[in-house]
């Protein structure tokens, strides 16, 4: 009731501008109150007409801001009610020697404060409730119910808040709601958050893988497109070569025609030159004979005149052969070239007939794998060397892939049967159905391995077993022998069963490594290469609270 009264009273003391309790309240002529700083800033932002922010009444000039003394006194008294008293200092109840030290932790169930040095002492004390629940001493006030002055040890599922027992069961605000112990609910929330975290990490990894695939595919397509561009350029260079060859042949036709014409022209010139030499020779003889006619003695013998006249008559009576001149019909020749140009232009001017989409995005359907992404990431954490988990195309896969087909302990002469994934082969006797979905090989294939080091687990009936190269677990070479169920996969290793679930007594910690069935594949390799004693309880390089069976 008092809390409701305070809330109602506080609503009347809130500034309409800053929505906080008044600070130096002033009153306008319209009787509305504001903080002096708030109304000053509001009027400073609006350089135009001055108005009241609440009733919107306009003023011709800025009115005087009078301090509301009555409201100021009420605000001061209200603020005095909300001044929290400093909490009393808590001291450790376990300190017996000297003055008690200030408490660092407070157990909400036992209501016992303790210092840092006595935290373990308090945890060892018997608790009648569900166990001790320690919080920081500074957070005790936050864990206290302001209405009932009791610690909030329950969690209301409806309101999603921590409540005390009086709020839940004794006519409280949360009566009838589903409640749970706050520690139990905290563990449930932690498990739920861890599960969601694993899912989100798996989704993040999947998205990262998709992005990597997209980036890789982008680079691959860019390389292919660049290669295609080069091939297209070579094709067009061939087209240019064809055009150059056609141009060469066309020019060669012109050159041949010109050479033929020049040959005919030279023959005509040679023939006319011979006729000219003959005419010049006769003309010279005729001129010489004409000079002799000046003397009358010439007439003594005129036979030479008759002979010369006959020759001259023969030379002048024969007609000259008609001269052949060149006639170049360039239009006819250019028409033939224009026909080729038109055909080529018609072929090239048309739109490029792109074939059926030669580059498109197609969905990538992931192939089914035998283990989930979380299991593979868990395995990759144990084995950070990515090359060790490569398939048969990798260095290790090639080394042990061949060993899987050779005759060895537990798989000699056995046919290979396909597993659930198309990437693995498992050795099976007599073509039986596969009991494991990954490649397997005997531990003797490891460095410094021998037949004496073949692992023998009691729950497998003393049978020789193989080691899975992907899941890092044991599997038998016999399919469902003796009615046994398929052997556990990673995450359910038979040699990592907690002590409360394993019925057999745990053996003492060995001082030296003997047969190493309790170690992971990577530790087998390390055990053969590193001197000294192997730490059986640090399988993956980190401390572990689980029990490991080594027999």
UniProtKB/Swiss-Prot annotation:
Superkingdom in the source lineage: Eukaryota
Q: Which stretches does the record call B box-type zinc fingers?
A: 92-132, 140-182
What Gene Ontology biological process does one annotation of this record name?
A: host-mediated suppression of symbiont invasion
The RING-type zinc finger ranges are 15-56
List, alphabetically, the PROSITE patterns matched.
Answer: ZF_RING_1, ZF_RING_2
- Identify this protein by name: E3 ubiquitin-protein ligase TRIM8
GO terms of molecular function: identical protein binding; protein homodimerization activity; transcription coactivator activity; ubiquitin protein ligase activity; zinc ion binding
Q: What does this protein do?
A: E3 ubiquitin-protein ligase that participates in multiple biological processes including cell survival, differentiation, apoptosis, and in particular, the innate immune response. Participates in the activation of interferon-gamma signaling by promoting proteasomal degradation of the repressor SOCS1. Plays a positive role in the TNFalpha and IL-1beta signaling pathways. Mechanistically, induces the 'Lys-63'-linked polyubiquitination of MAP3K7/TAK1 component leading to the activation of NF-kappa-B.
The record's disease note says: Focal segmental glomerulosclerosis and neurodevelopmental syndrome: An autosomal dominant disorder characterized by global developmental delay associated with variable features of focal segmental glomerulosclerosis, a renal pathology defined by the presence of segmental sclerosis in glomeruli and resulting in proteinuria, reduced glomerular filtration rate and progressive decline in renal function. Some patients have transient proteinuria and others require renal transplant.
Pathway assigned in UniProt:
Protein modification; protein ubiquitination
Oligomeric state and interaction partners are given as: Homodimer. Interacts with SOCS1 (via) SH2 domain and SOCS box. Interacts with HSP90AB1; prevents nucleus translocation of phosphorylated STAT3 and HSP90AB1. Interacts with MAP3K7/TAK1. Interacts with PIAS3. Interacts with TICAM1. Interacts with TRIM15; this interaction prevents TRIM8 cytoplasmic translocation.
Which N-terminal stretch is annotated as signal sequence? none
Q: List the disulfide bonds.
A: none
Give the classification, highest ranks: Eukaryota, Metazoa, Chordata, Craniata, Vertebrata
Tissue specificity is:
Widely expressed. Expressed in glomerular podocytes of kidneys.
Residue ranges the record marks as coiled coil: 181-249
Which protein family is named in the record? Belongs to the TRIM/RBCC family.
- Which source organism does the UniProt entry give? Homo sapiens (Human)
Show the catalytic activity: S-ubiquitinyl-[E2 ubiquitin-conjugating enzyme]-L-cysteine + [acceptor protein]-L-lysine = [E2 ubiquitin-conjugating enzyme]-L-cysteine + N(6)-ubiquitinyl-[acceptor protein]-L-lysine
Effect after changing residue 18 to S: Complete loss of ubiquitination activity on TICAM1
Q: Which InterPro entries match?
A: E3_ubiq-ligase_TRIM/RNF, Znf-RING_euk, Znf_RING, Znf_RING/FYVE/PHD, Znf_RING_CS
Question: Where does this protein reside within or beyond the cell?
Answer: Cytoplasm; Nucleus; Nucleus, Nuclear body
Q: Which Gene3D superfamilies match?
A: Classic Zinc Finger, Zinc/RING finger domain, C3HC4 (zinc finger)
């Amino acid at each position: 009731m008092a809390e409701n009264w305070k809330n109602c009273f506080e609503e009347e003391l809130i500034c309409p501008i800053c929505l906080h309790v008044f600070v130096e309240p002033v009153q306008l002529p319209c009787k509305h109150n504001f903080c002096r700083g708030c109304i000053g800033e509001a009027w400073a932002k609006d350089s135009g007409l001055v108005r009241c922010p609440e009733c919107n009444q306009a003023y011709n000039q800025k009115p005087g801001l009078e301090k509301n003394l009555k409201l100021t006194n009420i605000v001061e008294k209200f603020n005095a009610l909300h001044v929290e008293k400093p909490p009393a200092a808590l001291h450790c109840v376990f300190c017996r020697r000297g003055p008690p030290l200030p408490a660092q932790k407070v157990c909400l169930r036992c209501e016992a404060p303790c210092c840092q040095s006595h935290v373990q002492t308090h945890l060892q004390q018997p608790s009648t409730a569900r166990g001790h629940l320690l919080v920081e001493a500074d957070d005790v006030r936050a864990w206290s119910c302001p209405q009932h002055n009791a610690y909030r040890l329950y969690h209301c599922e409806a309101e999603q808040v921590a409540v005390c027992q009086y709020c839940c069961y004794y006519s409280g605000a949360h009566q009838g709601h589903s409640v749970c112990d706050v520690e139990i609910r905290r563990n449930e929330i932690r498990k739920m958050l861890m599960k969601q975290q694993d899912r989100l990490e798996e989704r993040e990894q999947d998205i990262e893988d998709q992005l990597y695939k997209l980036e890789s595919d982008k680079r691959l397509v860019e390389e292919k497109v660049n290669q295609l561009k080069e091939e297209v350029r070579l094709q067009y260079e061939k087209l240019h070569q064809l055009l150059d060859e056609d141009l060469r042949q066309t020019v060669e036709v012109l050159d041949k025609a010109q050479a033929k014409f020049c040959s005919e022209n030279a023959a005509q010139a040679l023939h006319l030159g011979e006729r000219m030499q003959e005419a010049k020779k006769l003309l010279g003889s005729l001129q010489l004979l004409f000079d002799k006619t000046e003397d009358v003695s010439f007439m003594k013998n005129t036979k030479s005149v008759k002979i010369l006249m006959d020759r001259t008559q023969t030379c002048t009576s024969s007609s000259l052969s008609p001269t052949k001149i060149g006639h170049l019909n360039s239009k006819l020749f250019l028409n033939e070239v224009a026909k080729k140009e038109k055909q080529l232009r018609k072929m090239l001017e048309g739109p490029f007939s792109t074939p059926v989409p030669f580059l498109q995005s197609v969905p990538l359907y992931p192939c089914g794998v035998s283990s989930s992404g979380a299991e593979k990431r868990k395995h990759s954490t144990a084995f950070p060397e990515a090359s060790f988990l490569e398939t048969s195309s990798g260095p290790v896969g090639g080394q042990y892939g061949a060993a899987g087909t050779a005759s060895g302990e537990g798989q000699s002469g056995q046919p290979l049967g396909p597993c659930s994934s198309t990437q693995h082969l498992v050795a099976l006797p007599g073509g039986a159905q596969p009991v494991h979905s990954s490649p397997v090989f005997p531990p003797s294939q490891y460095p410094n391995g021998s037949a004496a080091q073949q692992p023998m687990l009691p729950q497998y009936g003393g049978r020789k077993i193989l080691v899975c190269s992907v899941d890092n677990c044991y599997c038998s070479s016999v399919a469902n022998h003796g009615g046994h169920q398929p052997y556990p996969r990673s995450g359910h290793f038979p040699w990592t069963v907690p002590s409360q679930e394993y019925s057999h007594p745990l053996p003492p910690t060995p001082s030296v490594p003997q047969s190493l069935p309790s170690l992971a594949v990577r530790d087998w390799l390390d055990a053969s290469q590193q001197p000294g004693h192997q730490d059986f309880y640090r399988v993956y390089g980190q401390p572990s609270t689980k029990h490991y069976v080594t027999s």
